[in-house]
Curated annotation (Swiss-Prot):
The keyword Methyltransferase applies. It holds the Pfam family LCM. One of its GO terms (molecular function) is methyltransferase activity. One of its GO terms (biological process) is methylation. This is Putative S-adenosyl-L-methionine-dependent methyltransferase MAV_2110. Keywords: Methyltransferase, S-adenosyl-L-methionine, Transferase. It is an enzyme of class 2 (transferase). Exhibits S-adenosyl-L-methionine-dependent methyltransferase activity.
Amino acid sequence: MPRTDNDTWDLSTSVGATATMVAAARAIATNADNPLIEDRFAEPLVRAVGVDFFTRWVTGDLVAADVDDHDSGWKLEHMPVAMAARTRFFDSFFQGATQAGIRQAVILASGLDARAYRLAWPAGTTVFEIDQPQVIEFKTATLAKLGATPQATLRTVAVDLRDDWPKALVEAGFDKGQPTAWIAEGLFGYLPPEAQDRLLDNITALSADGSRLACEAIPDMSEVDTEKAQEMMRRATAKWREHGFDLEFGDLGYQGERNDVAVYLDGLGWRSVGVPMSQLLADAGLEAIPQTNDSVSVADTIYYSSVLAK
């Protein structure tokens, strides 16, 4: 079902199901030989959501070869490796920010992100998680049942990012006078182009000098045949439906020309360094993800780390 302006979801439907998919990939990456990341909460969270397809994937009852289209460049097989590299990037970002003295962190569209519970935060750090109310409530309750304890002061902000989230964040205790470490992981593709700009504007308005931002930017799709790319995605996930999971991924994102993230942030006073997923994989000693000519692949995604100078 196509997105609407006021649509909502839980972790088994729409955009929320992609958060569960990513957590499942983190769980598999965690359980790999010589794992690059360690997220012990990923698998129990996926199990608690209860989407059978992803539960079977993390337990090994379903393997990527069962559902992947071998002629497609987009495969479930690539997800654990890609999410391991992505997770490592954002984990390292927070580590660097806290080493620089930042003690306030914000995770936008936090989904099943358990960094507040699994990272070693310095004393005095406050972590804010922002997401839809159903998502926040489920994850918080599930982690409490697991006996998990936040490793920092955790403040959850149950608000849709299309609503007045800056007000809700400040009301939750956010201090605009303190430098902040922000992450927007796997978020921009689910926002219309103008909403992406508005989000960056709001982050800047809330950020003190020396704040940092890490984000995942959508590649330039101007040369991509959108209909052809969506058909490729439908083919890639056809066997998912045969195994009981039916989600039209092409309906979840927003098309349209976007401002280049680094250029836009530069205009707001941020200085950015970008690294493509292909480089993150190479730096971690992981196998490259094949690229195709008819669509934008995971390997094209750019990861930016930015610092604000006001």
